[in-house]
Amino acid sequence: MKVSIFSNNGLSSQKVATALQKGLTAAGVPIDSLDPDVVVTVGGDGTLLSAFHHYNDRLDKVRFVGIHTGHLGFYTDWRDYEVQELIDSLAQDNGQSVSYPLLTIQVEYADGTHPDQALALNESTIKKVSGTMVADVYIKDELFESFRGDGLCISTPTGSTAYNKSVGGAVLNPRFNAVQMAEIASINNLVFRTLGSPLIIPADEWIRIEPADPTDNVLMCDQLGIEGRPIKAIMYRIARQRIAFAEYRHTHFWQRVESSFIGRENA
């Protein structure tokens, strides 16, 4: 089994990455950043998101595991003082894993050029550079609503605890193979109406968003921007691919939610 170490540039993360590399070498575990079986990220959830996009053409072959060197994250199960325990688990790896849904994003451009596709681990957002975004929202090719507001957020179950939650979306257990759409500051009055609540879309349905103005839109895939050509439409659905994590220890999803947003000391 080959391991890649993917670290952020923080001093504490670099120290952990160096200790991890030395420990894996001593344990006889090969280090290979080009063709790994397991990618170990050192940092936080942002570092793991970066690693996911770096290796998203190898999702059928690679598993991820995260060491967090800052605050507790949803994707990082190991603390910086548990490096040796993780090395022992990697050395005894037998392929154990857990997988989570991903989001497929297909972008059609107003100039008729070839559509782009991307994968998101957390979410995708569409907003205007400035002013109100106006867009028609279709569910399974049926017009659902005409949206006016700051933007829309479409998230995966694991991404439901990220930006989606901050704009009023529901927290969704990742065992649900579904995507969620949450409105960002929608305009609701006697003239303009939207549903005004999050939507949960099953795996056999899809969301299509058609901006009224194809120009000056900002489309994000996790923390990455998608090329800023005039957009005709964006289609979202559950991806065929899934992300796999090496499951050396199990942390219940709701335990992650509680520890990140509530805290036992407040109980």
UniProtKB/Swiss-Prot annotation:
Q: Which Pfam families match?
A: NAD_kinase, NAD_kinase_C
- Say what the protein does: Involved in the regulation of the intracellular balance of NAD and NADP, and is a key enzyme in the biosynthesis of NADP. Catalyzes specifically the phosphorylation on 2'-hydroxyl of the adenosine moiety of NAD to yield NADP.
Q: What class of enzyme is it?
A: transferase
List the Gene3D superfamilies hit by this protein, alphabetically: Probable inorganic polyphosphate/atp-NAD kinase, domain 1 (3.40.50.10330), Probable inorganic polyphosphate/atp-NAD kinase, domain 2 (2.60.200.30)
**Know the name of this protein?**
NAD kinase
Q: Which cofactor does it need?
A: a divalent metal cation
Gene source species: Levilactobacillus brevis (strain ATCC 367 / BCRC 12310 / CIP 105137 / JCM 1170 / LMG 11437 / NCIMB 947 / NCTC 947) (Lactobacillus brevis)
Which residues are named in the active-site annotation?
Answer: D45 (proton acceptor)
The enzyme's E.C. designation:
2.7.1.23
InterPro entries in the cross-refs? ATP-NAD_kinase_N (IPR017438), ATP-NAD_kinase_PpnK-typ_C (IPR017437), NAD/diacylglycerol_kinase_sf (IPR016064), NADK (IPR002504)
State where NAD(+) binds.
Answer: D45, G46, N122, E123, R148, D150, T161, A162, Y163, N164, K165, S166, A185, Q223
- Please name the gene that encodes this protein: nadK
Q: What are the recorded Gene Ontology BP terms?
A: NAD metabolic process; NADP biosynthetic process
What catalytic activity does the UniProt entry give for this protein? NAD(+) + ATP = ADP + NADP(+) + H(+)
List keywords of the entry alphabetically: ATP-binding, Cytoplasm, Kinase, NAD, NADP, Nucleotide-binding, Transferase
